[in-house]
């Protein structure tokens, strides 16, 4: 029942890592501070750890991120706004900030060298980053300094203890979740957290591979397991969590979309007719868009109750999307380097320029109305035409 399976092409970080290795020529000939080795092959925890240090081995959870003089083309996995500041995270613990709308970037220290995959800033000062090795980082000053709050080592002990205590107190329904949790960390702490979302400066949630879900009500000082809150008996990979127009959604593999029921506090499954992975959901008060592999887009006009496929001109896997309210437009970016604008009806798609010769991983709108796209070739600014 609890057979572990590979993350495979269902995890965005794996898709991106494979493309990075293919385009960079791999790790073998790269130095430890080179961009090529910085990918660290997210798909393979062994290579992920081996690339961090040659001799002696230092676990990425124990090694601060290497500092670089020039980060303009280092690989980034996600980007977010912290007030007027932009913050991006990437391979091998890279954290970069920009205070001029993405025109220039500077690296800030990170306490780990694990790959960082996602960000959430509920306000201009408080922010969280998550990634490989189950790591959760926190900043209280808008991304200038970071501390580690949680990691896969903590998860293997503290999350299991939480479930075991509740089972011992009589809640036997939690046993399958404890079994899955134990299986997830049987091989060590490398299981990634793929996405994080904070409602405010106290309440947040992170999700990841094999149904992993954790939450906090005290700004990340303590984390508890939340596998049982999600209608996910197969423990599908959970690729993203976030809020759209007041509702909270989780996008997963095998066409699974979960919506938070405010009354019960549980995420209920809406199964689409899509067999692939969704990597995120964006939208507004009127429409939701779920995006996934090979340019896949699904649309809902009833707050996620039902979904239908949209004809899409996109070729690459859609890694990120944003709704730009002033222009009433959606912007999608892909692993094929595409950046495309679509009207709110999703009938008119227009390219924002030639495809970048890199993998796009994220997109953010600045306070000035420009687009900043993160990717494996670094960040780039683009006008919203």
Over which residues does each language-model region extend?
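Residue-level hotspots at or immediately adjacent to binding/recognition sites across diverse folds
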Residues: 2, 29-385
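Bacterial N-terminal signal peptides that target proteins for export
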Residues: 2-15
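Residue-identity detector for glycine
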Residues: 8, 25-26
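A periodicity- and composition-biased signal for non-globular, repetitive helical segments
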Residues: 9-10, 18, 36, 281
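Bacterial N-terminal signal peptides
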Residues: 12-24
């Amino acid at each position: 029942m609890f057979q572990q399976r590979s993350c495979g092409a269902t995890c965005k970080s794996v898709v991106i890592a494979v493309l990075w290795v293919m385009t960079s020529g791999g790790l073998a000939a790269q130095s430890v501070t080179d961009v090529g080795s910085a990918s660290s092959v997210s798909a393979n925890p062994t290579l992920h750890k081996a690339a961090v240090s040659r001799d002696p081995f230092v676990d990425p959870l124990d090694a601060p991120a290497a500092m670089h003089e020039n980060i303009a083309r280092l690989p980034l996995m996600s980007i977010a706004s912290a007030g007027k500041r932009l913050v991006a995270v990437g391979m091998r613990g890279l954290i970069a900030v920009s205070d001029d709308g993405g025109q220039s970037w500077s690296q800030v220290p990170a306490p780990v060298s694990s790959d960082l995959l996602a960000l959430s800033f509920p306000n201009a000062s408080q922010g969280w980053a998550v990634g490989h090795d189950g790591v959760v980082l926190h900043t209280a000053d808008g991304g200038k300094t970071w501390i580690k709050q949680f990691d896969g080592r903590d998860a293997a002990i503290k999350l299991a203890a939480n479930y075991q205590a509740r089972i011992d107190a009589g809640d036997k329904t939690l046993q399958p979740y404890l079994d899955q949790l134990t299986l997830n960390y049987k091989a060590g702490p490398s299981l990634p957290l793929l996405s994080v979302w904070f409602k405010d400066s106290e309440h947040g949630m992170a999700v990841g591979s094999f149904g992993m879900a954790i939450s906090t009500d005290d700004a990340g000082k303590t984390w508890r397991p939340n596998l049982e809150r999600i209608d996910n008996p197969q423990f599908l990979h959970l690729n993203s969590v976030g809020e759209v127009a007041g509702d909270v959604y989780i996008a997963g593999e095998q066409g699974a979309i979960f919506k938070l029921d405010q009354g019960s506090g549980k995420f209920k499954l809406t199964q689409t007719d899509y067999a692939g992975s969704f990597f995120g959901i964006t939208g507004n008060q009127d429409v939701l868009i779920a995006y996934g592999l090979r340019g896949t887009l699904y649309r809902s006009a009833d707050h996620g109750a039902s979904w239908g496929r949209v004809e899409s001109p996109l070729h690459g896997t859609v890694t990120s999307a944003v709704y730009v309210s002033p222009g009433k437009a959606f912007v999608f970016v892909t692993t094929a380097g595409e950046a495309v604008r679509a009207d709110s009806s999703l009938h008119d798609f227009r390219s924002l320029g030639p495809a970048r010769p890199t993998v796009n991983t994220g997109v953010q709108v600045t306070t000035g109305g420009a687009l900043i796209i993160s990717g494996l070739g670094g960040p780039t600014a683009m006008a919203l035409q």
